[in-house]
């Protein structure tokens, strides 16, 4: 969000260091080097070598030394998705007696709440794509149609409209799976009398507009 860096490499150890002097340094793995160069405004990109016995937290400490941050107060985004418990323990151990640490997990999240005009435009574009996906649901939500076909058509119109993958899978269920609240791999064929529950998002440049619909197939019963 701060730099434009577009990757799912956050599932591995990587750190963006920002200091009060305006220095911005990314520590990441080699597979994300060109990703950062092509998608972000980060100029200083450092690589830690991913091999048996690697300790990227120690590589981070070298960067902190370079920035004269020893003995200073550092905020860490502990709630970051890629910072696993193991990596957090390694990070804490590396920085023990080196600097003081504060949990600043909400610092960026709170800033992101206030959207720019450009971001709002992205969300609105995502909403248009979500509506187009819903149009496909209405076309194919019929007896004898596979949930797979519905998902395929929804994703087709989103990608053809310039959209992206969503942050998580579309949630779809009918029959015995109609009340599930999470995606699972089994796909059903819609029955003569059924209920289709579907939750999805139109996504544009990773900005989402999410929707949910419950659609009776055939005649609605008293529960509906």
Residue locations for each model-derived region?
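Active-site neighborhoods and metal-handling regions in enzymes and metal-associated proteins
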Residues: 1-224
């Amino acid at each position: 969000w701060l730099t434009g860096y577009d990757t799912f490499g956050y599932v591995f150890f990587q750190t963006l260091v920002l200091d009060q002097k305006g220095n911005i340094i990314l520590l990441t793995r080699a597979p994300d080097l060109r990703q950062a160069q092509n998608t972000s405004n980060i100029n200083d990109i450092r690589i830690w070598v991913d091999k048996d016995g690697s300790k990227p937290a120690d590589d981070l400490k070298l960067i902190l030394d370079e920035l004269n941050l020893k003995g200073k107060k550092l905020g860490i985004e502990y709630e970051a998705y890629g910072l696993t418990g193991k990596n957090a323990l390694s990070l804490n151990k590396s920085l023990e007696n080196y600097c003081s640490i504060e949990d600043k997990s909400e610092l960026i999240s709170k800033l992101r709440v206030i959207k720019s005009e450009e971001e709002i435009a992205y969300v609105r574009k995502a909403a248009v794509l979500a509506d187009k996906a819903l149009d496909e649901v209405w076309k194919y939500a019929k007896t004898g149609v596979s949930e797979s076909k519905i998902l395929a058509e929804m994703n087709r119109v989103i990608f053809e409209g310039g959209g992206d993958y969503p942050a998580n899978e579309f949630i779809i269920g009918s029959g015995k799976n109609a009340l599930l609240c999470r995606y699972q791999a089994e796909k059903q064929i819609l029955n003569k009398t059924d209920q289709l529950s579907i939750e999805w998002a139109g996504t544009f440049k990773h900005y989402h507009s999410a929707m949910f619909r419950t659609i009776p197939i055939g005649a609605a019963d008293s529960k509906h």
